[in-house]
Amino acid sequence: MKVVIYFLIGFLLSFRLEAETIKIGSLQYGSVNWELKLIKELELDKKNNFNLEIVELASKNAAAVALQGGAVDLIVTDWFWVSRQRSEGRLFSFVPHSMAAGGLIAPKDSNIVNDVDLKNKKIGIAGGQVDKGWLIFRAFYKKKYGEDLLKLSKPIFGAPPLLNKKIKQKSFDAILTYWPYQAKLLTDENFEKIIDIKDILSELGIPSGMPVIGWVFKEKWGEKSTEIFKNFLKASDEAKQLMLESDDIWDDVRPFM
């Protein structure tokens, strides 16, 4: 009888541990991955009573497909994507993650002084045609000048690391990229920021401090996984706070960058 009881206890414990695993899809080159890796490195998931499984993906589209197909529980994406999905009857939810955004970067010798100089220019765009930065920038340009940048310029879409490499090779006149890759380029004195996405949001009348990206998940998953999600958000906040307050913690983050 004792053997049976021990077996049942072991089975229930293993089931409980499996139920507390949260799978998060993350871009290999994204800053979200830094945070998730730090959570694992410091065992903040164990501290907060869940197990984090990081599923590294190659692109934003791959992340969306993984979430829709149930391969992961969470991804980070923008509220444009969530809004579109919900309008088509696919119920995804959004919890704010970050207000960080990128911007338009150009070589100092490119003759691009401001956004009006983009006509017929080859622009590298991080992500795809429905990426938040590109949609925001197009809306801003349309409002300001009455023209669509999609038709006015020559956009080419690609992964941020590749865009950084290509603009240094003068393959682009400018790139619209995410903030970590913007920051890397701006350490090079040959490049400058033309306009920031945050400034564009302000021009469009969107309140300052509005998070652009967030944790996105199926509504049904959120309803049945409230506790583990709260635990994850707590670990996420702890990781962010450590990165904000400690210079030393970046030594742990650096290998993932």
Residue ranges and their predicted role:
Residues 5-14:
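Bacterial N-terminal signal peptides
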Residues 12, 43, 140-143, 252, ...:
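Generic structural signal for isolated residues within well-ordered alpha-helices
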Residues 15-19:
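Sec/Tat signal peptide C-region and signal peptidase I cleavage site
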Residues 79-80, 156, 160-256:
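Pocket-lining segment of extracytoplasmic ligand-binding domains
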